[in-house]
């Protein structure tokens, strides 16, 4: 086995893996990621690193806090969700700005046997959610309306099973995140909202989570299929992650 096969096996077993002080360049970041499959198209909303359209550039400070400060799984509203993400810290605050990941395997295992059975055949609508706000930034002008309509048409919604089975591990997991799941199919609005509220609370348990305090040059890789993540907005200084 080559080193990338070994990294993939470690990822499948641990869901999130970390590399300290890599000082990896954008080109090396791209080349590393390409060893695990075809890269996803440029992000529908966020800007990219100059010269590298497939690398998302995230910049936050006290005047521009992260808009991903709720539990989410990356891009579940797309028809083809990227199976993994690789994030590199470029500039980070001395205090704050941590990222948390939560296990969707553990969330499934904590369900009662009755709920596991009830949820087995349920499907959910995953919607682009607050990304509409970015698409609609210039709605006063014609270009803003066109951009929102284009985004809704291309990335608007996707239907996914609430209980999924991981294609590699074969283990079941709870395929829910509060940011992008908009409705439970077959349920009324009130029923759907009640189920979503229960699942949001159910999945936010410290015992299922890991918290990472970033240092410049750190790199994290996670399995998008079986993790939810949250960026904290408790840092006053600038933080940049490319």
Where are these regions (language model features)?
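Non-heme Fe(II)-dependent double-stranded beta-helix
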Residues: 1-99, 131, 138, 156, ...
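Short, surface-exposed secondary-structure boundary micro-motifs
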Residues: 22, 225-226
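Histidine-centered metal-chelating micro-motifs
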Residues: 72, 226-229
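Double-stranded beta-helix
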Residues: 100, 104-219
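Short active-site-adjacent structural elements
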Residues: 184, 222, 229-230
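Conserved small/polar residues in nucleotide/adenosyl-binding loops
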Residues: 231-240
